[in-house]
């Protein structure tokens, strides 16, 4: 094999082995309906006229960005958990972001860590470990594989382990676009109920692999949902047409399709 051929093969293998959760994926995204940035005039107008946006102010108040490319699931979980149970006196205190030197001048009786869920402390309640989220091989269907991030069903289990009542929907061919639209709109019109979606970025016209984020609102005039993307480094909040969103969820992830999780508090 020539030197040029060996270099080409090495580059090909390097691309193939990049985990989906971290891949930037510069390949052309599939052709889909246009995504409208939330920060645009049109994006703000859609929120203003929406009649399915009661979740938005609560989620926006609790919003945080993921700290790494595999934590979109835990970050979405933390945002929703704080929206549901924020200011409860029994919330966990995450000390992982405080270093010993940070505490040297703080009175010993005072705990500076705020009582709230974080993308770090929500993981420990679920079956999937932090190491597995970050690529430690795990057994799935009898095979040892790396499974970065969270599949929809794994995230649903973690949310339940943290005390939420959920309903998982896997978006396969049996689930119609109209049924999905109706369920999501009904949830977004009820206070205290939330939606987390799992979708493939490439399928919705963005660069990247699988991703998870909450939904914030629905605009009937444009038939689009507001995706509160937890990775602003890759993409900001966008209005995503229903057909595009369904296309992104109706994609395969390891053992089954992606989908959405309805968090029910009533």
Specify the residue positions occupied by each region the protein language model found.
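N-terminal secretory signal peptides that target proteins for export/translocation
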Residues: 1-2
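Active-site-adjacent structural segments surrounding the nucleophilic cysteine of cysteine proteases
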Residues: 21-148
